[in-house]
A protein has these predicted regions:
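Short, solvent-exposed interaction modules
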Residues: 73-107
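Short N-terminal segments immediately surrounding and downstream of signal-peptide cleavage
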Residues: 21-39
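C-terminal partner/receptor-binding element of secreted or periplasmic proteins
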Residues: 114-125
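Primarily extracytoplasmic ectodomains and periplasmic/lumenal surface modules that are beta-strand-rich
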Residues: 42, 50-53, 60-62, 107
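Tandem-repeat architecture and repeat-register "anchor" residues
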Residues: 56-57, 111-112
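A low-complexity, Ser/Thr/Gly/Pro-enriched, surface-exposed linker/loop concept
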Residues: 21, 58-84
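Sec-dependent N-terminal signal peptides
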Residues: 4-13, 17
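Short beta-strand motif characteristic of blades in beta-propeller domains
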Residues: 41-48, 97-103
């Protein structure tokens, strides 16, 4: 009986350890939020009030490899209803794509980060 109980405890702990937490699980009323990408050197910085997004890259190789570049500088709130936490990014299975959600109005955008010329933010209708 004791072995079965120990086995069940180990099994339940292993299930909990394998559970994945969604990227957006952390709730905050902050103006800016960093999102991890599958590339260890790259993050996406989101203005949670306006939906504006920047690609941020860091490096240990030197300053020429560190940069912050615009993905979308369009204020998607158009100046109305700007409140922290209005916009949030969600990972997709494609490492270069995220979904941007307007949590108040329900609008969505495809966000693609990458090299110059590959970056885009497209409204999903």
């Amino acid at each position: 009986m004791k072995r079965i109980l120990i086995f069940l405890m180990v099994l339940s702990i292993s299930f909990m350890a394998n559970a994945q937490t969604p990227v957006s699980a952390e709730q905050c009323d902050c103006n800016y939020k960093l999102y991890e990408t599958s590339n260890m050197w790259t993050f996406l910085k989101l203005d949670t009030r306006t939906g504006q997004i920047w690609q941020v890259q860091y490096s240990v190789e030197g300053p020429e490899y560190r940069f912050e570049t615009e993905l979308s500088t369009v204020d998607l709130s158009y100046g109305a209803n700007k409140k922290p936490g209005k916009y949030e990014l969600y990972k997709t299975q494609n490492i270069h794509n995220f979904i941007l959600l307007d949590k108040v109005e329900g609008k969505t955008w495809q966000v693609q980060w990458g090299k110059a010329g590959e970056r885009q933010v497209i409204r999903i209708y």
